[in-house]
Amino acid sequence: MHNSLDNLKRVQNKVNEIVNEKQLKTYPKIIVVTKTFPFSKISSLLNSGHTHFGENKIQEAEDKWGEVKSKNKNIQLHMIGKLQTNKAKKAVALFDFIHSLDNQKLALKICQYEKELNKKIKLFIQINLADESQKSGIKLNELNDFYQYCLKELSLNIIGLMCLPPINSNSQEYFSKIKKAADRLNLRDLSMGMSSDYEAAMLSGSTYLRLGTIILGERNIT
């Protein structure tokens, strides 16, 4: 018997504790990152009333959530992985949030399919703060122009910024930079913080925590 629900409650209690101790203004939502996990591992969370879940691959998300989501309109599904333009239509159809908007071509496709499907997606611009070649994301010095393009030319619903700090880095430093960038654009939401650094992310004002391992356990990736 897995203890995903107990783990979620434990994390929720820890989040409450941090919010109260640090007198934070923001209480972040917990996105349970379910990529690679079977639905049997997730069902107890869904039955408990948890609604925010994250996936990083379109096909897996369709197979796992397509039918379930059609029956439960409260589910809020988050695309947290790299999104290719040829998968944009499926992403717009299935997801409620996309955390990985990182180029003009993708922005155009999302705009196109929003109109076709008569649906507005909540979008985060992904930032590549450390200019890591293996990671996607807009450079910080390109952010303002890209944001204005998405807003004024495409009327996209940009709600915030997302980042993935470099492994073994001072996450707090990167989170603080993202917070300042969001403040400059008057963006309220921040998608930052995973199982290993969510406490630091909270101190910088994260509004969405992307948590997988700490709730569902280690992934079996072959």
Question: Can you name each region flagged by the protein language model?
Answer:
Residues 202-222:
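Short, basic/aromatic-enriched C-terminal tail that caps enzymatic domains
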